[in-house]
Design a protein with these regions (language model features):
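Extracellular beta-strand/beta-solenoid scaffold signature
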Residues: 53-57, 79, 103-113, 129-136, ...
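Short, T/G/N/S-enriched strand-turn elements that build extracellular solenoid repeat scaffolds
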Residues: 56-62, 77-86, 91, 102, ...
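Bacterial signal peptide processing site
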Residues: 20-23
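Right-handed parallel beta-helix
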Residues: 94-97, 118-129, 141-154, 171-184, ...
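C-terminal motif of bacterial Sec signal peptides marking the signal peptidase cleavage site
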Residues: 16-18
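Extracellular beta-rich repeat passengers
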Residues: 264-412
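Right-handed parallel beta-helix/beta-spiral solenoid domain characteristic of secreted/periplasmic
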Residues: 45-54, 88-132, 154
Length: 424
């Protein structure tokens, strides 16, 4: 007999003991059938008592495909993380700020909730103060994060969990109307995934507000990224199972006041992101940035950069390429550059322009290449290439220029369509 079978048996007994019988007189477990020839559909309602944490983990362990697990209004404390590995389960609270799952007393360093199954919907609750990541899903295709809050209530601290919402290695990822505050890496992070939508969400006081990393096909739109270190990041890194991130559209977002000091633990890639970065594209391809409101980001509104470290991954291209920047609005910003860019500010009278490219065109001794960067903004919008050429930086060869690069048009990726997206 497997350990999981034993756990399910014990958990089922615990749930029945907590809920009593399963008749219609007991609202804790109701059974419904949408049609005679279909499997029974269950709705399990977790009672709001002092055993809430045990009841919830029991329900997650014993869930059947198609179950809905309902959480009541209230604040409930946990000492251990939760996990779900059953397909087609919906976990639904009474609403953001109404159903609050507090992990302030969590033992260990794990995530608050780990999902490793497909076709899962998470909606209508708040996660607070997890020791590790807020909600992580891995290999969870067709997952929906909707109407959720993940936050660390002590403000931006390096001891906070790294990621708020953290889907990885998945296809058809929908993040809709999610709020994240205080993540020490990224508020909303989607990594090594395909076919992604992140929309109508609020990210604030994180290191990175939204990060798309080593992923293919993402639409990031109608979000507000405010008071982070960096608003929206699109990165590609070496030595990961999926390398060659491409085809991201960043549009109709409000990306303002992202001037929080970088509080990422040393060694994290985001620890290098300058405070005051609006949008940053690092080593990614076919990224389209349009229709965004960018305001008061103190370093620069848009940064295009190459990966700086030495690498051995032969699949990897460390340069940002085929990037299109058009039809955005810009105001303020660039007046207090941070990090390595602070060294360049005196060259421009202390003020960096709206769009900054590091000017790296080769790596590890390779010949220079044309990166086809399309800067299609009005002439009044400032731009500079720092003229770095290649990392590590050689100050003697720097060649800054405000002349925009010649470029060919880049076809915009088609809008992302996710079949389980019911609201649009």
């Amino acid at each position: 007999m497997s350990l999981r079978t034993i756990m399910i048996g014990a958990s089922a007994l615990a749930l029945l003991a907590a809920c009593g019988d399963t008749s219609s007189e007991n609202p804790s477990l109701s059974l419904e059938s949408s049609a005679p020839d279909r499997p029974q559909v269950r709705t399990v309602t977790i009672p709001a008592d002092d055993q809430f944490a045990t009841h919830l983990q029991t329900a997650l362990i014993t869930a059947a495909e198609g179950d809905t697990i309902k959480l009541p209004e209230g604040t409930f404390s946990f000492t251990d993380g939760l996990s779900l590995d059953v397909d087609r389960v919906t976990l639904a609270g009474a609403g953001q700020g109404k159903t609050i799952l507090s992990f302030a007393g969590q033992e260990g360093a794990g995530e608050g909730l780990l999902v490793t199954s497909d076709d899962v919907t998470l909606t209508g609750f708040t996660m607070q103060d997890t020791a590790g990541d807020g909600i992580k899903s891995k290999g969870a295709d067709r997952i929906t994060y909707r109407d959720l809050t993940v936050e660390w209530t002590g403000g931006p601290l390096p001891t906070n969990g790294a990621y708020g919402v953290y889907p990885v290695e998945s296809t058809d990822v929908l993040v809709d109307a999610v709020t994240v505050r205080g993540a020490s890496d990224a508020g909303i992070y989607v990594g090594q995934s395909r076919n992604i939508i992140v929309r109508k969400s609020l990210v604030e006081y994180n290191v990175a507000g939204i990060e798309i990393e080593n992923s293919i096909g993402a639409d990031v739109h109608d979000n507000t990224a405010e008071n982070n270190t960096g608003g929206v990041l699109v990165f590609d890194l070496p030595d990961l199972p999926l390398v060659g991130g491409n085809s991201t559209r960043i549009f109709n977002n409000k990306i303002i006041n992202n001037n929080t000091d970088n509080f990422a633990p040393p060694g994290n890639i985001v620890a290098t992101v300058p405070s005051g970065s609006g949008i940053m594209v690092l080593a990614n391809e076919n990224v389209h940035i349009f229709g965004n409101e960018l305001a008061n980001n103190r370093t620069a509104h848009v940064l295009l950069a190459a990966y700086q470290d030495v690498f051995e991954d032969e699949r990897y291209n460390p340069l940002a390429r085929n990037v299109v920047i058009r039809d955005n609005t810009y105001s303020g910003g660039g007046d207090d550059p941070q990090g390595a860019l602070a060294e360049f500010a005196p060259v421009f009278g202390g003020q960096l322009p709206a769009i900054v490219w590091d000017g790296v065109v080769s790596w590890q001794g390779n010949e220079a290449v044309d990166l086809n960067l399309v800067i299609a903004e009005a002439d009044t919008i400032g731009y500079v290439s720092l003229g770095v050429g290649e990392y590590p930086i050689d100050l003697a060869t720097l060649a800054p220029t405000s002349q925009r690069p010649e470029a060919m048009p880049v076809a915009e990726p088609a809008p992302i369509v996710i079949d389980h997206d019911k609201t649009g």
